[in-house]
């Protein structure tokens, strides 16, 4: 075996006979898997190699190597299936468990990068530290069986149809990278830089994207449930045809984001910034959008049933077919908004602000509107709002005006009083 201290130990797969003796590579019979295992040639298991393992475990180690040898011998035309790969990997994990304390017992695989930066992860098991040599990166295994890419520069890398579950990309530079058809369950991207990255048809459930920089990135047809995106920078990101159930976007910066056909019940967007964003065909049922900045956003075909929107800002926002039934929208700000075919029935709109709004077929049936302030722009046509409710809203508003000034208000100074109420509510929100 080629051996240099503890830095490079390759396990041979075809060079041990059934009597545990060591044979020379020149006398080793070629197998159908030679093409696949050609990077193992000129390696031997000898006493020096076995000395890396506990003396009492030598027989076990040799037995495991023989089992792997038989698997390789049975491979047709040098090909290896994912199922066979997993079996072999299990043997090597078992081998590593017998390494003595002098060894660095991290099991790694070799990641080959071709000239187009496409990745092929081969089954090369050895005990080694992370190294970068020529165009090959030695990637150590994580404790959970994934790969440790942490803090590497992988700009423009293309990874397709790989199992990267439990891998670690923390602090990685992944600008313009592409992950397609990959299993990335429980993968860690904490603090990764990934502008213009593409995740296409990937499994990202239970992963960690906290504090990433993902400007202009794309999630397309992904499953990203129970994912942590808190404090993430995702402005101008595109998220479409994706599941985000129970994911956490606490204080995420998502200005100008484009969300299309997203299923995200129970999502947490508390204090997130989605200003100037476009949201269409979104299921935010039972979501938390409290204190979210949606100023100058466009919201169409949104399900916000039974959601929380405390102190949410929707000024100068266009809303069409937004369903907020049974939602709690206390202190929400709709100033200068345009609402069309929206439903607020049975919702809590206590102290909501609706100054200078445009309404078209908006439903406030059975809504709680105590303390609401509302002024509708004159000259608007097709205002289909229940007249009794509108009178009630205006009555509540005028009563609130009186409590702020100590006297009833005329129409001339109504707007000035409304602005004072707004300032008071803003102070309460802070």
Swiss-Prot record:
| InterPro entries referenced in this protein's UniProt entry, alphabetically | 5peptide_repeat, Pentapeptide-BTB/POZ_domain
According to the lineage, what is the superkingdom?
Bacteria
Q: Which Gene3D superfamilies match?
A: E3 ubiquitin-protein ligase SopA
State the protein's name.
Uncharacterized protein YjcF
Which organism is this protein's natural source?
Escherichia coli (strain K12)
């Amino acid at each position: 075996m080629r051996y240099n201290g503890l830095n490079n130990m390759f396990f041979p797969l075809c060079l041990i006979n059934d009597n545990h003796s060591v044979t020379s590579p020149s006398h080793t019979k070629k197998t159908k898997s030679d093409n696949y295992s050609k990077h193992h040639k000129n390696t031997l298991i000898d006493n020096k190699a076995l000395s890396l393992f506990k003396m009492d475990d030598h027989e076990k180690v040799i037995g495991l190597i023989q089992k792997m040898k038989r698997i390789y011998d049975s491979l047709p035309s040098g090909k290896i299936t994912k199922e066979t790969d997993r079996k072999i990997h299990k043997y090597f994990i078992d081998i590593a468990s017998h390494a003595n304390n002098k060894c660095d017992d991290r099991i790694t695989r070799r990641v080959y990068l071709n000239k187009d930066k496409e990745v092929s992860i081969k089954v090369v098991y050895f005990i080694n530290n992370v190294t970068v040599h020529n165009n090959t990166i030695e990637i150590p295994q994580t404790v959970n069986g994934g790969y440790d890419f942490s803090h590497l520069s992988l700009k423009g890398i293309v990874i397709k149809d790989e199992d990267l579950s439990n891998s670690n990309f923390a602090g990685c530079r992944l600008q313009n990278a592409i992950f397609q058809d990959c299993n990335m369950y429980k993968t860690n991207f904490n603090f990764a830089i990934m502008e213009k990255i593409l995740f296409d048809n990937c499994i990202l459930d239970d992963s960690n994207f906290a504090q990433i920089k993902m400007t202009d990135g794309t999630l397309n047809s992904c499953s990203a449930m129970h994912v942590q995106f808190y404090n993430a920078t995702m402005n101008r990101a595109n998220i479409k045809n994706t599941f985000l159930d129970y994911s956490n976007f606490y204080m995420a910066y998502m200005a100008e984001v484009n969300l299309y056909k997203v299923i995200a019940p129970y999502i947490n967007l508390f204090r997130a910034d989605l200003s100037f964003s476009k949201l269409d065909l979104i299921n935010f049922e039972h979501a938390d959008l409290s204190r979210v900045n949606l100023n100058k956003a466009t919201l169409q075909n949104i399900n916000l049933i039974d959601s929380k929107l405390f102190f949410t800002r929707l000024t100068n926002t266009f809303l069409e077919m937004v369903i907020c039934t049974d939602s709690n929208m206390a202190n929400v700000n709709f100033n200068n908004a345009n609402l069309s075919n929206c439903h607020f029935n049975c919702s809590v709109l206590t102290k909501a602000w609706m100054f200078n709004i445009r309404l078209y077929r908006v439903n406030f049936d059975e809504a709680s509107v105590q303390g609401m302030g509302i002024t509708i722009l004159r000259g608007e046509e097709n205002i289909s709002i229940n007249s009794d409710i509108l009178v009630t809203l205006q009555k509540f508003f005028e009563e609130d005006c009186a409590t702020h000034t100590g006297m009833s208000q005329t129409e001339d100074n109504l707007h000035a009083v409304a602005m004072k109420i707004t300032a008071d509510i803003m102070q309460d929100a802070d």
